[in-house]
């Protein structure tokens, strides 16, 4: 059975756990619509990405 030869120090344990942190998603304000969207993602309300129409927006008539 494999057993560690030395106790893992708190510093080494912290270095290992530093990759486990969860980051909150970042949002940017869209220049055209003013809506919040993820960077490098298509604006789902307008269908625009980098100034080009990529998707046709769905019109919600309720």
From Swiss-Prot:
Positions with biased composition (Basic and acidic residues): 28-44
Pfam family of the protein (one): Ribosomal_L32p
GO molecular function: structural constituent of ribosome
GO cellular component term of the entry, any: large ribosomal subunit
InterPro entries cross-referenced by the UniProt entry: Ribosomal_bL32 (IPR002677), Ribosomal_bL32_bact (IPR044957), Ribosomal_zn-bd (IPR011332)
Alphabetic keyword roster: Ribonucleoprotein, Ribosomal protein
Residue ranges with Basic residues bias: 1-16
Keyword check for Amino-acid biosynthesis: no
Region (Disordered): 1-62
GO BP terms, alphabetized: translation
Signal peptide residue numbers: none
Family matches, as NCBIfam families: rpmF_bact
Family: Belongs to the bacterial ribosomal protein bL32 family.
Protein name: Large ribosomal subunit protein bL32
């Amino acid at each position: 059975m494999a057993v560690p030869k030395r106790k893992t120090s708190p510093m080494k344990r912290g270095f290992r756990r530093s990759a486990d942190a969860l980051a909150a998603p970042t949002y940017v304000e869209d220049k055209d619509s003013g809506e919040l969207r993820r960077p490098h993602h298509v604006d789902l309300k307008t269908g625009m990405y980098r100034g080009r129409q990529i998707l046709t927006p769905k019109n919600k008539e309720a």
